[in-house]
Amino acid sequence: MAKEIFYSDDARNRLYEGVKKLNDAVKVTMGPRGRNVLIQKSFGAPNITKDGVSVAKEVELKDTIENMGASLVREVASKTNDQAGDGTTTATVLAHAIFKEGLRNVTAGANPIEVKRGMDKEVAALIDALKNISKKVSGSKEIAQIATISANSDESIGKLIADAMEKVGKDGVITVEEAKSIQDELSVVEGMQFDRGYLSPYFITNPEKMQVELSNPFILLFDKKITNLKDLLPVLEQVQKSGKPLLIIAEDIEGEALATLVVNKLRGVLNISAVKAPGFGDRRKAMLEDIAILTGGEVISEELGRTLESATINDLGQASSVVIDKDNTTIVNGAGEKSAIDARITQIKAQIAETTSDYDKEKLQERLAKLSGGVAVIKVGAATETEMKEKKDRVDDALSATRAAVEEGIVVGGGSALILASKSVNLNLQGDEAIGAEIVRRALRAPLRQIAENAGFDAGVVANAVETSKDANFGFNAATGEYVNMFEAGIIDPVKVERVALQNAVSVASLLLTTEATISEIKEEKAMPAMPDMGGMGGMGGMM
């Protein structure tokens, strides 16, 4: 297929048109008074959203070169969302502003490579300045404020996320689901829970709830199948003498072994229950080891030279209670040493940082949460499915922003942080590098200007007021139209969101500025289909 090539300013100008069209669609969602965007779906009701990345993902342009420009900035929004969970609109607005300002200078004769170098130096200095003006998150009030802002000023969502994080801790897993009603709900599973239920209903101790409830049980962990009762007898006799209940977690228990355990339970000889070990393969071994560390026990493993017959009561873990239903097992207050649990948590965090697989990362985070203290489930309620999707998007954004804030700290929000950080940066660059740095500094006003514009205020006046202020916490509250102390007003942003948005925006804008040619396929207009054969109509002449 024939290709079309554009060079120099012509190529960059067409790329800019695509970036501008994407930015114009995304920027309207910015700030507390940002507007919604209605997105047509191939089937079903249209999607209403105020989420920048959701808008960006839907933008596909007819012109091939314009679409290339738009797709690069779309990647900025997606990458920012993946890394920080929020700041997608900020990243898009910054990328557009940097490219626009840079294009003007490159067209006027500036060297794009030198300009890029100056931009990179300015960004590195700005990130250090951001860290210097940041504060650590000190309590659930600030967590609620961050979540509220990210959820488009919805205080109920902010409170819900703050409550969830308070209950499960910063490393706990918080999942978002759709509720069956119009009310938002928060439920918390304390302790370690895994998705394996009892092996026999005869183990049930609470018939009303159809649950097995064990108080202060011993916990035996074995990584193979148990089919022969003879191997179990030594440890069973020791547990019976202690008078405590026993939970067996093994790959499987079947045949004679399971039947004998059930008979002993029914006769009241031993209060016992059994479940399959969670996970598969290497993940199962890791989870058994997690349970062992949490409960202060040991995994009886033939790989370590241990047989089930050699197990003693000293190898067993303990917990204050265990609850088992047909689908799940929950271990509460394991007797493991805190230092051992903390060491295991550190090890899992290191594995999360190293892994490149999203699936492995998700599973490792689940394990981390189970060791750290629980899982919280936020159930989002709404009157219609369309509203539910929009609200769920906002809760996901707010949750990610909150995690980012806990991780790297907070700065003033409302688009002011980058402007305030730039006041302490003075690199004294020369030539085209200085132009690159100035391009970034000018672009830093764009998010604040857009927030003010969306709220119906004069963008230039607002940006100038923040820029000339001597107060390090000064900013503009677009919801009320007042200049305030941003920390006192609770208008705060995570440092990570600002940092990632700036880095990604400059990265793609500098790539676009240093583009000297574009190559794309020529779209060929499809020929009109031929008229159908009018055979048989010729005989109409005889009708005259």
From Swiss-Prot:
Recorded superkingdom: Bacteria
Main localization, broad class: cytoplasm
Keywords: ATP-binding, Chaperone, Cytoplasm, Isomerase, Nucleotide-binding
One cellular component term from this protein's GO annotations in UniProt: cytoplasm
Single GO MF descriptor: ATP-dependent protein folding chaperone
The keyword Isomerase is annotated on this UniProt entry: yes
Binding positions for ATP per the UniProt entry: 29-32, 50, 86-90, 414, 477-479, 493
EC number, as in UniProt: 5.6.1.7
Protein's UniProt keywords contain rRNA processing: no
Reaction equations catalysed: ATP + H2O + a folded polypeptide = ADP + phosphate + an unfolded polypeptide
InterPro entries: Chaperonin_Cpn60_CS, Cpn60/GroEL, Cpn60/GroEL/TCP-1, GroEL-like_apical_dom_sf, GROEL-like_equatorial_sf, TCP-1-like_intermed_sf
One biological process term in Gene Ontology: protein refolding
Compartment annotation: Cytoplasm
Bilayer-crossing regions: none
Similarity comment: family membership: Belongs to the chaperonin (HSP60) family.
Subunit details: Forms a cylinder of 14 subunits composed of two heptameric rings stacked back-to-back. Interacts with the co-chaperonin GroES.
Function description: Together with its co-chaperonin GroES, plays an essential role in assisting protein folding. The GroEL-GroES system forms a nano-cage that allows encapsulation of the non-native substrate proteins and provides a physical environment optimized to promote and accelerate protein folding.
PANTHER family assigned to the protein according to its UniProt record, in alphabetical order: 60 KDA HEAT SHOCK PROTEIN, MITOCHONDRIAL (PTHR45633)
Name of protein: Chaperonin GroEL
Taxonomic lineage: Bacteria, Pseudomonadati, Campylobacterota, Epsilonproteobacteria, Campylobacterales
